[in-house]
């Protein structure tokens, strides 16, 4: 059994099927990268996993607990969200809080740590990211890459079972893509389980242990990263990868 297992996850909206009977297993320590065209349902899948959007039906097994998406209690939702931290594409930092406060406040108010405990955790993470000198700056004083890295630090500080990343490099220049790649690889070395949505093949190949192709709400293929990129099994995957490589060339 994986750390996370999703069975028959379906999401409909106004009569349209956005995600169709998805089955997915993520093992502890894996970095699953989900790729696909714009509108394929990648971000919706992340939001459904974190319950920012409620799936219409399906089941989730997280650790030793299994949940029916159609019968979640308020306690179930809190438990799931505590284990699945999400790093948003637009960073989602509080502009009226410093970089340090953006990391510490979820620890103080969400996990009931003391201010001293939260600050120690945040300062350690900022030091690892070589962002100690940015601790007292506000998001508007930080570059996009720095904001993204603060978002990553905030997610790591919560010590979730899994960190979800929504297009973490989509608005960054190539040099910063390399920095974010190294940050994610560092998390992987620590044993952190991650699910990453991206449309950038080079980035996906750098960080993935497993890769999945989502197309029009259907999970077409899931395979180890080396196999996925060198010997994809499904014709749809082959066509997508060839088109994406041509576009990036």
Task: Describe each region flagged by the PLM.
Residues 67-85, 115, 231-232:
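ABC ATPase NBD coupling module
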Residues 174-176:
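Helix N-cap at the start of a conserved alpha-helix in ABC-type nucleotide-binding domains
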Residues 138-142, 146:
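Conserved ABC ATPase signature
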Residues 50:
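Helix-to-loop junction immediately C-terminal to a conserved catalytic motif
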